[in-house]
Protein backbone atom coordinates (compact mmCIF):
# COMPACT_ATOMS: atom_id res chain seq x y z
CA UNK A 1 0.00 0.00 0.00
CA UNK A 2 1.49 3.33 -1.00
CA UNK A 3 2.23 5.98 1.60
CA UNK A 4 -0.22 8.86 1.98
CA UNK A 5 0.48 11.60 -0.51
CA UNK A 6 1.46 14.93 0.93
CA UNK A 7 -0.87 17.79 0.08
CA UNK A 8 0.60 20.48 -2.08
CA UNK A 9 0.44 24.05 -0.81
CA UNK A 10 -2.09 24.86 -3.51
CA UNK A 11 -4.41 22.13 -2.23
CA UNK A 12 -3.92 23.32 1.31
CA UNK A 13 -4.79 26.86 0.34
CA UNK A 14 -7.89 25.71 -1.47
CA UNK A 15 -9.17 23.77 1.53
CA UNK A 16 -8.54 26.78 3.74
CA UNK A 17 -10.48 28.99 1.37
CA UNK A 18 -13.32 26.51 1.41
CA UNK A 19 -13.50 26.55 5.19
CA UNK A 20 -13.48 30.35 5.12
CA UNK A 21 -16.33 30.38 2.63
CA UNK A 22 -18.26 27.97 4.84
CA UNK A 23 -17.72 30.38 7.72
CA UNK A 24 -18.98 33.32 5.69
CA UNK A 25 -22.00 31.28 4.61
CA UNK A 26 -22.85 30.60 8.26
CA UNK A 27 -22.42 34.29 9.03
CA UNK A 28 -24.62 35.20 6.11
CA UNK A 29 -27.30 32.80 7.33
CA UNK A 30 -27.18 34.26 10.84
CA UNK A 31 -27.35 37.84 9.57
CA UNK A 32 -30.26 36.92 7.29
CA UNK A 33 -32.17 35.41 10.21
CA UNK A 34 -31.43 38.48 12.32
CA UNK A 35 -32.68 40.80 9.59
CA UNK A 36 -35.85 38.76 9.19
CA UNK A 37 -36.50 38.91 12.92
CA UNK A 38 -35.89 42.65 12.90
CA UNK A 39 -38.31 43.10 10.01
CA UNK A 40 -40.95 41.04 11.79
CA UNK A 41 -40.55 43.08 14.95
CA UNK A 42 -40.79 46.35 13.02
CA UNK A 43 -43.96 45.18 11.29
CA UNK A 44 -45.50 44.16 14.61
CA UNK A 45 -44.60 47.52 16.15
CA UNK A 46 -46.14 49.36 13.21
CA UNK A 47 -49.31 47.32 13.52
CA UNK A 48 -49.52 48.03 17.24
CA UNK A 49 -48.99 51.76 16.71
CA UNK A 50 -51.73 51.79 14.08
CA UNK A 51 -54.12 49.93 16.36
CA UNK A 52 -53.42 52.39 19.17
CA UNK A 53 -54.06 55.34 16.87
CA UNK A 54 -57.32 53.83 15.64
CA UNK A 55 -58.47 53.14 19.18
CA UNK A 56 -57.74 56.68 20.33
CA UNK A 57 -59.50 58.07 17.27
CA UNK A 58 -62.58 55.97 18.00
CA UNK A 59 -62.57 57.07 21.63
CA UNK A 60 -62.34 60.72 20.64
CA UNK A 61 -65.23 60.25 18.23
CA UNK A 62 -67.37 58.64 20.93
CA UNK A 63 -66.50 61.39 23.40
CA UNK A 64 -67.46 64.09 20.91
CA UNK A 65 -70.73 62.36 20.16
CA UNK A 66 -71.56 62.04 23.85
CA UNK A 67 -70.80 65.74 24.40
CA UNK A 68 -73.03 66.64 21.48
CA UNK A 69 -75.88 64.54 22.89
CA UNK A 70 -75.52 66.16 26.31
CA UNK A 71 -75.58 69.63 24.76
CA UNK A 72 -78.69 68.71 22.75
CA UNK A 73 -80.40 67.36 25.87
CA UNK A 74 -79.62 70.59 27.73
CA UNK A 75 -81.10 72.64 24.89
CA UNK A 76 -84.35 70.67 24.89
CA UNK A 77 -84.89 70.98 28.64
CA UNK A 78 -88.07 72.70 29.85
CA UNK A 79 -87.57 76.48 29.88
CA UNK A 80 -89.55 76.96 33.11
CA UNK A 81 -87.04 74.77 34.94
CA UNK A 82 -84.22 76.91 33.62
CA UNK A 83 -85.82 80.12 34.88
CA UNK A 84 -86.47 78.66 38.31
CA UNK A 85 -82.91 77.51 38.60
CA UNK A 86 -81.57 80.93 37.70
CA UNK A 87 -83.71 82.67 40.30
CA UNK A 88 -82.65 80.44 43.18
CA UNK A 89 -78.97 80.22 42.34
CA UNK A 90 -76.63 82.14 44.62
CA UNK A 91 -73.96 84.14 42.94
CA UNK A 92 -70.37 83.44 43.92
CA UNK A 93 -68.62 86.18 45.87
CA UNK A 94 -65.42 86.19 43.89
CA UNK A 95 -62.58 88.42 45.02
CA UNK A 96 -62.81 92.18 45.22
CA UNK A 97 -60.48 93.73 42.73
CA UNK A 98 -60.11 97.05 44.56
CA UNK A 99 -56.75 96.01 46.00
CA UNK A 100 -54.08 93.63 44.82
CA UNK A 101 -54.26 90.15 46.23
CA UNK A 102 -51.95 89.64 49.19
CA UNK A 103 -49.22 87.02 48.95
CA UNK A 104 -50.28 85.50 52.27
CA UNK A 105 -53.63 84.51 50.80
CA UNK A 106 -51.83 82.72 48.02
CA UNK A 107 -49.77 80.73 50.49
CA UNK A 108 -52.70 79.78 52.69
CA UNK A 109 -53.30 76.05 52.99
CA UNK A 110 -49.77 75.09 52.04
CA UNK A 111 -47.33 73.39 54.36
CA UNK A 112 -47.87 72.85 58.08
CA UNK A 113 -50.96 74.52 59.56
CA UNK A 114 -50.29 77.39 61.98
CA UNK A 115 -50.83 76.82 65.69
CA UNK A 116 -53.79 78.67 67.14
CA UNK A 117 -52.49 80.72 70.11
From Swiss-Prot:
Keywords: DNA-binding. Disulfide bonds: none annotated. Residues 1-117 are annotated as: Disordered. Residues 51-68 have a biased composition (Basic and acidic residues). Residues 1-17, 39-50, 71-117 have a biased composition (Basic residues). GO terms for molecular function: DNA binding. Transmembrane segments: none annotated. Binds DNA in vitro. This is Histone-like protein Hq1.
Amino acid sequence: MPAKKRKTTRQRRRSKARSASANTAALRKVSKERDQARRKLRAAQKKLAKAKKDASRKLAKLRKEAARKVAAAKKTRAPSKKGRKKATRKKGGGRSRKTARKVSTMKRGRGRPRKKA
